[in-house]
Amino acid sequence: MPELPEVETTKNGISPYLEGAIIEKIVVRQPKLRWMVSEELAQITQQKVIALSRRAKYLIIQLETGYMIGHLGMSGSLRVVEKGDLIDKHDHLDIVVNNGKVVRYNDPRRFGAWLWTEKLDEFPLFLKLGPEPLSEEFDSDYLWQKSRKKQTALKTFLMDNAVVVGVGNIYANETLFLCNLHPQKTAGSLTKAQCGQLVEQIKQVLSNAIQQGGTTLKDFLQPDGRPGYFVQELRVYGNKDKPCPTCGTKIESLVIGQRNSFYCPKCQKR
């Protein structure tokens, strides 16, 4: 599943082709995604793109009359193609702009979304989201207060979008390894120092992943077709039975909250 770095990479990749351009039309080939594609999108014509931004794992395209909001789901990706390029099987939506380019949405599993809102601050899916992990608001004091009396597993806690957005499975695993914290440790048992370390490493891991263009495991590609190279930096995620890069102990895995978790039993003692 594309996580925050992959969505940020996608935003950065398509921004030069969209910002300031005029959308001539939006072609919807398959409206049945996770939710039905908003009917307003097919009616957009001759609208200027004001800006692109991101909230959590949502891509936001600001137009003159409102906002297109995209989510890549489990297998979605956006790529920049030329008008007239062949359409692939899972190409479900095109944003056709006046510079000869098409921003094309591909999603084999159709678990993504394309929605519309006129008022971003009233968009229902954004109302209960926590702070952005790379923002100043997300600091050790905030995480310390949020974690008090929480009996949930630490990894589940970090992946809760009401706590902090965008820390998905890949990057939660990597962060906990770098902090020498077991994924099943209860969130409420964190010390103030551990909260500070977690915040620092979350910011560092996500920033590094963005610089590397995200992580390509199966479906994700950057808008220019290149893979995300952070996959080469993964220390524990997906590395069950491989040696820990720190101590050489075999990496183990377990399921927490229906997600695979990877950790070193020696470096990350519970």
UniProtKB/Swiss-Prot annotation:
**Cofactor note text:** Binds 1 zinc ion per subunit.
Question: Coiled coil: which residue ranges?
Answer: none
Q: Signal peptide span per the entry?
A: none
The yes or no answer to whether the keyword Endoplasmic reticulum is present is no
- Kindly identify the residues recorded as the active site: P2 (schiff-base intermediate with dna), E3 (proton donor), K57 (proton donor), R259 (proton donor)
Its Enzyme Commission number?
Answer: 3.2.2.23, 4.2.99.18
List the Gene Ontology MF annotations in alphabetical order.
8-oxo-7,8-dihydroguanine DNA N-glycosylase activity; class I DNA-(apurinic or apyrimidinic site) endonuclease activity; damaged DNA binding; zinc ion binding
Q: Which residues bind DNA?
A: H90, R109, K150
Name the coenzymes or cofactors required: Zn(2+)
What is one Gene Ontology biological process annotated in the Swiss-Prot or TrEMBL record? Answer: base-excision repair
SMART domains (alphabetical): Fapy_DNA_glyco, H2TH
The catalytic activity, as recorded, is:
Hydrolysis of DNA containing ring-opened 7-methylguanine residues, releasing 2,6-diamino-4-hydroxy-5-(N-methyl)formamidopyrimidine; 2'-deoxyribonucleotide-(2'-deoxyribose 5'-phosphate)-2'-deoxyribonucleotide-DNA = a 3'-end 2'-deoxyribonucleotide-(2,3-dehydro-2,3-deoxyribose 5'-phosphate)-DNA + a 5'-end 5'-phospho-2'-deoxyribonucleoside-DNA + H(+)
Q: Which domain of life is it from?
A: Bacteria
Which keywords, in A-to-Z order, does the entry hold?
DNA damage, DNA repair, DNA-binding, Glycosidase, Hydrolase, Lyase, Metal-binding, Multifunctional enzyme, Zinc, Zinc-finger
Which parts of this protein are zinc fingers (FPG-type)?
235-269
Question: What job does this protein perform?
Answer: Involved in base excision repair of DNA damaged by oxidation or by mutagenic agents. Acts as a DNA glycosylase that recognizes and removes damaged bases. Has a preference for oxidized purines, such as 7,8-dihydro-8-oxoguanine (8-oxoG). Has AP (apurinic/apyrimidinic) lyase activity and introduces nicks in the DNA strand. Cleaves the DNA backbone by beta-delta elimination to generate a single-strand break at the site of the removed base with both 3'- and 5'-phosphates.
Quaternary arrangement and interactors, per the entry?
Monomer.
Q: Which family does it belong to?
A: Belongs to the FPG family.
Kindly provide the name given to this protein in its UniProt entry: Formamidopyrimidine-DNA glycosylase
* Native source organism of the sequence: Pasteurella multocida (strain Pm70)
This protein's encoding gene: mutM
